[in-house]
């Protein structure tokens, strides 16, 4: 009984860590999509719902895999394809739906596992280390710890900047709590910094912090490209490769490569149907690779307990779009989450 309680407590703490990053990632991608004319509240709601279903589907019968829209892929689609090329977001949803369904078919063939088996151990380690450095660099840029410079490659920020100060303090606080073997180090550190920055007035709690989820306004709005359909083929193939490569980079960190294509096939299927309600494609998030490699406890439905708790916590955040959007206005807390997960991945990569 004691071991069962410890497993449940460990799963709950891991779920808090994962959801802390996942929720802010969804807010970031929803803000990006809102720049194309897509309503933020609707994009947030359908992304949460798609992430919940995708996480359960990808994790079924295996390890915990968190499914999220990729900030890198969404940024490319928003700035390069929708804004620069003039493709409407409805057409992009249609392309994403076709690409996801094609990916679901291709990843169910017998040759799909060859890609992951072909990756040597050094490449797997390099992918994990690359993901960790990417997250650390993103956190440093968002927190203005590193600044672009016209004279040198980059330059450091100063602690006189409140964003840099609170982010750096939060990272040190999380490291100290983690060194004290406190499992909830990341959520606790993020909560303390969020409270301090709110008390200092760097962000405000909205007058209406909760909002009824808008899950129907984007339903069945996707369309196929209205111009020459052949011109969309390079975009579709590039999107398919990007989705596969980003997910494979996380799956490559797993020791069991034979199971790598099954969660990817299920995730593509979920993404294809999620496009019908207005959600953009999902990938297996890099935070999934930060989890321990030991065998997880599965629930009665065959879903790992950590994945199930993460999905429930994400579902609880469904009406919290205004509150999370306000928190992201001063990105100290998101930067702490990204930096902490990046450090976890760095340690994981060095131990591989």
Describe each region flagged by the PLM.
Residues 101-118, 141-150, 169-184, 323-324, ...:
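Membrane-water interface regions at transmembrane-helix termini and the short interhelical loops
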Residues 36-56, 262-263:
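Loop-to-helix transition at the N-terminal end of transmembrane alpha-helices
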Residues 1-42, 155-156, 186-261:
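Helix-loop-helix hairpins and the membrane-proximal interhelical loops
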Residues 2-30, 50, 59, 64, ...:
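Helix-loop-helix junctions within the multi-pass membrane cores of secondary transporters/permeases
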Residues 34-38, 79-88, 114-121, 133-175, ...:
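Inter-helical loop and helix-membrane interface segments of multi-pass membrane transporters/permeases
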Residues 97-106, 137-142, 181-182, 196-208:
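Structural signal for alpha-helical transmembrane segments and their membrane-water exit/capping regions
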Residues 13-16, 34-42, 59-66, 152-163, ...:
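Short, amphipathic, aromatic/basic-enriched membrane-interface segments that mark the entry/exit
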Residues 71-72, 96-98, 165-172, 185-196, ...:
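Hydrophobic mid-bilayer segments of alpha-helices in multi-pass membrane transport proteins
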